[in-house]
Amino acid sequence: NMDQTVYFTTLDQYKLSPAISVQTVEGAPVLASVPGTVYSIEEDPQTGTTVTMEIGSGYQAVYGQLKDITVEEGDTVTKGTVIGYVGTPTKYYSKEGSNLYFAMKKNGEPVDPIAYLL
């Protein structure tokens, strides 16, 4: 629920989060949750290496805290394609440990990613 605050251990504060953090091990493969086109690959201070995919109808899937990216901007990928691997968490997530940052946007605005995983 994007209307409730989440406690961030590293930051020692509660804040709203537009994403979910999936706890996992560093080096775990990250698979595309849906088919789409790689829109951008960027370095972000909070989410680290981040891949954003256009998935149609104004939606984007955003995957962060990655390393060893296996796709390039403009690539078309199918569901289940390895897009990269879980990397070392950024300083914003150091106490939470290795995780996949996953967010969804519609027309540039965050939407609850849980609704799209069910």
Residue ranges of each PLM-predicted region?
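Short glycine/threonine/proline-enriched tight-turn/helix- or strand-capping micro-motif at secondary-structure
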Residues: 2-31
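Zn2+-dependent peptidoglycan hydrolase active-site motif and core
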Residues: 32-67
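Conserved, short, structured surface segments that act as functional micro-motifs
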Residues: 75-118
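Short, acidic/hydrophobic/Gly-rich beta-strand patch recurrent on exposed beta strands
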Residues: 11-13, 20-23, 50-55, 103-104
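Residue-level recognition of beta-strand microenvironments
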Residues: 1, 41-42, 69, 86-89, ...
